[in-house]
């Protein structure tokens, strides 16, 4: 959902629009759309409070439109069901977030679209393709204000839409749709997703506690699987360089916020799903190899490194995985990328760029310098409005990362002389 109001979140009671697909955690998504239970040109009216969410399905009653919307997920596809309660005109209204290159085209029952995913800074962009089909023949398709309005027979109270997405091509999206959701059987799609989640969550058994306590536990476990996301498509993936690469038997994962996940989520997955965790670490290696600067990312998404928060914690994740026996990633190559990153990329919070005078000071003195009282910031790259230098947090986080790099190097047999600088920074 995208919400009305300044907060733009669940504190708002009105929904502005829905999205067919969300490429990144907490992002607004691509391919905005909404169902209309009346005049398709009137503003969309809906609230989200009458919703029911499970790992394998979601439904919500959009009271302003008198429409119940349900969705069941596949791996790279989904099945939507729209139940219109009011007689009269029914429509689905689609658009693309990117107003320059984006499009949604409907011919007969077939839907084809392109949108562009981008980050808040505008330096990360990736094409997203969608293919879909309706179970009901539209009575009309028209363009209105950059939107594609798809009308359906008034007597058709239920409309189903199956869709699939790809970062590679429209043809790849069509193949994923045919493979994952070949029909409009909602119970089958939701049931298949339920089996997958039941098997996944059932890997951990708990004893004792109340029903509420167990619900909290398994909900938390479910949420740890939100990231990272496997974006391998028929053995290929879109890399940080914008090119299509062969996965070579190691699935490619993106959408990680390592500042949030290095402490618990990654260590847990190294225990529960070691093969996947190794693939995730190898994905980080590939990202480091495929970006222009050769830097290890910290907040990787489909098209690059968001580079949010402070410090660089993939070293901690990789050390932990290695010590838990995860071996299916190129650890020595990972070390070289991490070492190169530490020596050439700045530690300034929320800034992806070369070393600044603050980094030079840190390497010489062992701590990140702060500002004197009432001193005005002058260093290029430091956010003067909100984030600032965060000198204490950066120094503490850098010490942890330096310790992890030194320990990781010793695990790999790296020459001790190369590790001395990290041992010194860790103290």
Summary of predicted features, one role per range:
Residues 1-316, 320-396, 401-427:
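Accessory carbohydrate-recognition regions in carbohydrate-active enzymes
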């Amino acid at each position: 959902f995208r919400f009305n109001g300044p907060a733009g979140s669940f504190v708002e009671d009105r929904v502005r629009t829905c999205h067919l697909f969300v490429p990144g955690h907490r992002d607004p998504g691509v391919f905005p759309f909404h169902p209309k239970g009346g005049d398709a040109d009137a503003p969309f009216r809906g609230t989200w409070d009458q919703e029911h969410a499970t790992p394998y399905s979601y439904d919500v009653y959009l009271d302003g439109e008198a429409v119940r919307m349900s969705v069941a997920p596949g791996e790279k596809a989904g099945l939507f069901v729209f139940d219109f309660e009011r007689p009269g005109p029914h429509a689905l209204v689609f658009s693309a977030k990117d107003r320059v290159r984006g499009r949604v085209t409907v011919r007969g029952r077939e839907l084809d679209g392109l949108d562009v995913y981008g980050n808040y800074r505008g330096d990360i962009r990736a094409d997203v393709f969608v293919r879909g089909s309706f179970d009901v023949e539209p009575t009309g398709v028209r363009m209105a204000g950059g939107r594609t309005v798809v009308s359906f027979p008034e007597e058709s109270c239920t409309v189903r839409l199956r869709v699939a997405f790809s970062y590679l091509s429209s043809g790849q999206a069509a193949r994923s749709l045919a493979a994952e959701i070949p029909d409009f059987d909602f119970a089958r799609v939701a049931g298949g997703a339920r089996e997958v989640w039941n098997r996944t969550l059932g890997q951990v058994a708990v004893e004792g506690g109340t029903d509420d306590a167990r619900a909290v536990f398994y909900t938390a476990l479910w949420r740890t699987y939100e990231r990272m996301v496997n974006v391998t498509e028929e053995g290929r993936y879109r890399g940080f360089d914008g090119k299509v690469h062969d996965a070579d038997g190691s699935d490619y994962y993106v959408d990680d916020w390592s500042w949030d996940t290095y402490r618990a989520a990654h260590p847990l997955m190294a225990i529960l799903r070691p093969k996947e965790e190794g693939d995730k670490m190898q994905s980080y290696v590939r990202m480091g190899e495929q970006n222009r600067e050769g830097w290890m990312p910290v907040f990787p998404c489909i098209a690059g490194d968001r580079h949010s928060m402070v410090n660089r914690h993939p070293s901690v994740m990789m050390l932990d995985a290695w010590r838990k026996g995860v071996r299916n990633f190129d650890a020595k190559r990972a070390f070289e990328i991490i070492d190169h990153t530490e020596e050439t990329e700045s530690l300034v919070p929320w800034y992806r760029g070369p070393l600044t005078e603050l980094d030079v000071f840190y390497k010489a003195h062992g701590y990140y310098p702060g500002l004197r009282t009432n001193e005005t910031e002058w260093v290029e790259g430091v956010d003067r409005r909100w984030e600032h230098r965060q000198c204490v947090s950066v120094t503490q986080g850098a010490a942890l990362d330096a310790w992890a790099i030194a320990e990781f190097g010793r695990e790999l047999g790296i020459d001790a002389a190369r590790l001395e600088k990290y041992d010194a920074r860790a103290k």
